[in-house]
From Swiss-Prot:
InterPro entries: Folylpolyglutamate_synth_CS, Mur-like_cat_sf, Mur_ligase_C, Mur_ligase_C_dom_sf, Mur_ligase_cen, MurD
Binding positions for ATP per the UniProt entry: 138-144
Family indicated by similarity: Belongs to the MurCDEF family.
Gene Ontology terms: biological process: cell division; cell wall organization; peptidoglycan biosynthetic process; regulation of cell shape
Entry's EC annotation: 6.3.2.9
Pathway assignment: Cell wall biogenesis; peptidoglycan biosynthesis
Signal peptide coordinates: none
Gene Ontology CC annotation, any one: cytoplasm
Name the record gives this protein: UDP-N-acetylmuramoylalanine--D-glutamate ligase
Source organism of this protein record: Bordetella pertussis (strain Tohama I / ATCC BAA-589 / NCTC 13251)
EC class name: ligase
Transmembrane stretches, start-end: none
Length: 510
């Protein structure tokens, strides 16, 4: 037996539970380490299987595919560790029973982000590679903040890679960087609540919780568990950043030392390091609270045992740029910009390059994305608005009357937070999907007209009839898409195609 075979035989058996993007990345990572693998999925032909089999041709892999609704009784035999896919709900069968067996057998359960954290720890020892790590979580805005933060960092002269929930998987990005001998100075990680549930040792240099509203309660069970999952990233972070407009986010940092906390919000910032918005002479500004001392402040003296904890001082407000100079639309995106700048500033980057990049940033697809204007009506694709909080933010942020297209799979959400914002900002609502009628029922007290549509074509045409010059037709469904579409990008693409078709029918091109 050669050396490689010996090391593989001695390595503990790892079970990859679920062959989504993170499961594939974890399998590839462990194969690089010479670990024997057992791979299972409820599907007989999960996506990417052929590519994975080709990549792991020389690895020791046992495939258990097509398990359906019940895992084989011997699935855990010989297993030392389980890598759990974030797509599997831990309190639902058959995953619940398997995880209970794992606990009884003292089998460790981890996620791909935990493996990434351990990989960085290993690289620190073997190659003295110690990158900065920034982490972003929250119900809405994660992808925008992650992508923008990476661009701000690169504008400031540091190399950065974005990974995690934004795709690619963190381990896939790390393997690519290793293979190209191009390890970045900074990792910018978008982390979902699912991923944080199985992450224990990641200690970011800075982490932000953007907001916490109802979502994924089918996965977490209740709002408290969902918020706790988000909060996991703040305590180990050297710098914790929260949205001070969000009571649940603010509560997460109450026990943390004030000097290690920063915030952003819709109001004027009062404490050094905080950021916010200011309305002056009819112009809204992105602002920062900076120290009154132009020299670098002296380090804080060692605190005596019974002394009160240190607090952050007030400072002077600096106007950075007008909100109207941003290409991304809405107050919620102005807040996303503040969060991204705070993360980048944690790396001691200057304002100038960041502000130039921020001015040119056009946003991410399907997130308050202007498709085009037809007859002085804006058509906006916010298909990524898959929960009530996202739709509330979009309605509040646009600053114009809206004909809202909403509906789909509601995921057991409470739709009542839509009532006050629809009453204030919506001229009409067009409802689609299996839970469209449920949304309409909740919105009855608003008095806002609601119309049902059988498909996206009818929804766009009906919304166009209801809109008036100066309005926006906003696709922000507050629901998942799987009842009518492959996913939320497909939903957004169909919306955009129908808008373009409407423009052609009305004789408007480009």
């Amino acid at each position: 037996m050669n050396t490689t075979e010996t090391s593989r035989a001695a390595a503990p058996l790892v079970l990859i539970l679920g062959l989504g993007e993170t499961g594939v990345a974890a399998a590839r990572w462990y194969a690089r380490q010479g670990s024997p693998l057992r791979v299972t999925d409820s599907r007989a032909q999960p996506g990417g299987l052929a590519a994975l089999q080709a990549a792991l041709a020389d690895a020791t892999v046992e495939y258990r595919l097509g398990c359906g609704e019940q895992f084989p009784p011997d699935l855990l035999d010989g297993v030392a560790q389980i890598v759990l896919s974030p797509g599997l709900v831990p309190h639902e069968s058959p995953t619940r029973e398997l995880l209970e067996q794992a606990r009884e057998r003292n089998v460790e359960v981890v996620g791909e982000i935990e493996l990434f954290a351990r990989a960085l720890a290993g690289l620190a020892e073997s190659r003295e590679y110690r990158p900065r790590v920034l982490a972003i979580t929250g119900t809405n805005g994660k992808t925008t903040v992650t992508a923008l933060t990476r661009q701000l960092i690169e504008a400031g002269g540091m190399s950065a890679r974005a990974a995690g929930n934004i795709s690619p998987a963190a381990l896939a990005a790390l393997m690519d960087a290793l293979d190209q001998d191009d390890l970045p100075q900074v990792w910018v990680l978008e982390l979902s609540s699912f991923q944080l549930e199985t992450t224990r040792t990641l200690a970011p240099d800075a982490a932000v919780v953007l907001n916490v509203t109802q979502d994924h309660l089918d996965w977490h069970g209740d709002m408290q568990a969902y918020a706790q999952a988000k909060a996991r990233i703040l305590k180990p972070a050297r710098l914790a950043i929260v949205n001070r407009d969000d009571p649940l986010a603010v509560a997460m940092v109450e026990s943390l030392q004030a000097l290690n906390v920063r915030s952003f919000g819709r109001d004027v910032p009062a404490l050094v390091g905080d950021m916010g918005l200011e309305l002056g002479q009819g112009v809204a500004w992105l602002t920062a609270c900076e120290s009154n001392d132009f020299d670098e402040p002296a380090p804080a003296p060692r605190r005596k045992k019974d002394a009160p904890p240190p607090t952050r001082a007030g400072g002077r407000m600096s106007r950075l740029m007008p909100v109207d100079a941003l290409r991304i639309r809405g107050v919620h995106n102005a807040l996303n910009a503040l969060a991204a700048m705070q993360l980048a500033r944690s790396l001691d980057l200057g304002w100038g390059p960041m502000l130039r990049t921020l001015r040119d940033y056009a946003g991410e697809p399907h997130r308050a994305e202007l498709v085009r204007s037809i007859g002085d009506v804006d058509y906006i694709n916010d298909s990524k608005g898959t929960n009530v909080g996202a739709t509330v933010a979009a309605l509040e942020g646009l600053g114009q009357q809206v004909v809202l297209i909403a509906g789909g799979q509601g995921k057991g959400q409470d739709f009542s937070p839509l009532v006050p914002v629809v009453r204030r900002h919506a001229r009409a609502v067009v409802l689609i999907g299996v839970d469209g009628a449920a949304i309409g029922k909740v919105l009855e007290p608003t008095g806002v007209p609601c119309a049902a549509a059988a498909d996206m074509r009818e929804a766009v045409r009906r919304a166009a009839e209801l809109a008036q010059p100066g309005d926006a037709v906003l696709l922000s469904p507050a629901c998942a898409s799987f009842d009518m579409f492959r996913n939320y990008p497909h939903r957004g693409e169909v919306f955009a195609a129908e808008v373009r078709e409407l423009a052609l029918d009305r004789g408007e091109v480009a």
